[in-house]
C-alpha cells in the first residue's frame, strides 16, 4: 500500500481526526468507524452495551435480594453465632478471585449442568459469578446488617417495639438511604467487573468488546471503539451517581 493509499484509508476510517474533532462529531451522534471491520461504532457499541446492562442490573438485583435477606436477618439477631457465621462465610467466599470463580463455575456447568438450556443457565451463572466474585453480596450484606442494627438500636425504634406496634413502615423509610448508597457504590464496581466475567463466559457485552478492541490484530488496536466504550461506561456510572444524589432529598426530607 502506497503512502497516498494509507492516507486515504486513514481518512476514511477517521484515524486522522483530532481529539477535539472527535468530540464535535460525538455531539451529533457520530462515534466514528471501527478500524477492523469498517462498521459504525455507535451501532456496534449499543448492541454490546445492552447485553452488559442486562448482566449488570440482573446481577445487582440478585445480589441485593440475597444480601438484603441475609443482612436484615442478621440485624434482627445481633450477636448470634449463626448470623456471624453466615456473614463470615459469604465474606470468605467473596474473597475468591472473580476469574478463578468464573472458571470453576464454567467447569461445573460443563460437567454437571448440560441437561439445562445453555443460554439461561450460562446467563444465571454469569450473574451469580459477578455478584459473588466481585464481593457485592458480602459487602451489601455487611452494610445492610450494620445499618439495620444501628437503626433498631435507636430510641424511637425501641419505643415503637415496646408498644408492640409494627415497625415495618419506620424500618423501610429509614433504610432507603443506606440501600441507595450501597447500590450506587457497588454499581460502578459491577460495571468494571463485567470485563472479566464477559471474557470468561464469552458473553458479548461492552467489556468483551473493549478487551477485544485492545488486543492487537494485524498490528492494529481499534481505538475508535475503545474511546466510545470507555466514554459509555463512565457516562453510565456518572448518571447512576447523579440519579441517587437527586433521589436522596426526595426519600429523606431532612436533606433538603
Which residue ranges define each predicted feature?
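Hydrophobic alpha-helical transmembrane segments of membrane transport/permease proteins
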Residues: 1-20, 109, 113-124
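An internal, D/E-rich "acidic patch" concept
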Residues: 10-64, 68
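Amphipathic alpha-helical recognition patches that constitute DNA-binding helices
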Residues: 14, 18, 22, 40, ...
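A short secondary-structure junction motif
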Residues: 26-30, 112, 151
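Alpha-helical transmembrane segments of integral membrane proteins
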Residues: 49-82, 98, 117-256
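Membrane-water interface segments at the C-terminal ends of transmembrane alpha-helices
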Residues: 88-117, 131-133
Amino acid at each position: 500500500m502506497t503512502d497516498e493509499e494509507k492516507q486515504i484509508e486513514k481518512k476514511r476510517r477517521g484515524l486522522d481526526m483530532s481529539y477535539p474533532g472527535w468530540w464535535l462529531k460525538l455531539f451529533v451522534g457520530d462515534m466514528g468507524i471501527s478500524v477492523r471491520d469498517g462498521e459504525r461504532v455507535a451501532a456496534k457499541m449499543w448492541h454490546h452495551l445492552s447485553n452488559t446492562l442486562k448482566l449488570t442490573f440482573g446481577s445487582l438485583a440478585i445480589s441485593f435480594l440475597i444480601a438484603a435477606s441475609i443482612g436484615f436477618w442478621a440485624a434482627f439477631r445481633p450477636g448470634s453465632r449463626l448470623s456471624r457465621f453466615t456473614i463470615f462465610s459469604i465474606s470468605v467466599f467473596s474473597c475468591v478471585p472473580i476469574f478463578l470463580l468464573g472458571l470453576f463455575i464454567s467447569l461445573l456447568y460443563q460437567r454437571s449442568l448440560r441437561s439445562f438450556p445453555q443460554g439461561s443457565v450460562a446467563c444465571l451463572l454469569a450473574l451469580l459469578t459477578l455478584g459473588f466474585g466481585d464481593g457485592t453480596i458480602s459487602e451489601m450484606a455487611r452494610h445492610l446488617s450494620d445499618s439495620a442494627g444501628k437503626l433498631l438500636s435507636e430510641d424511637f425504634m425501641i419505643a415503637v417495639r415496646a408498644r408492640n406496634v409494627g415497625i415495618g413502615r419506620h424500618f423501610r423509610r429509614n433504610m432507603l438511604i443506606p440501600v441507595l448508597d450501597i447500590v450506587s457504590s457497588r454499581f460502578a464496581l459491577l460495571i468494571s467487573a463485567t470485563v472479566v466475567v464477559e471474557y470468561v463466559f464469552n458473553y458479548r457485552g461492552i467489556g468483551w468488546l473493549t478487551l477485544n478492541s485492545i488486543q492487537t490484530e494485524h498490528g492494529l488496536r481499534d481505538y475508535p471503539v475503545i474511546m466510545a466504550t470507555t466514554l459509555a461506561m463512565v457516562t453510565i456510572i456518572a448518571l447512576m451517581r447523579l440519579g441517587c444524589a437527586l433521589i436522596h432529598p426526595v426519600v429523606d426530607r431532612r436533606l433538603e
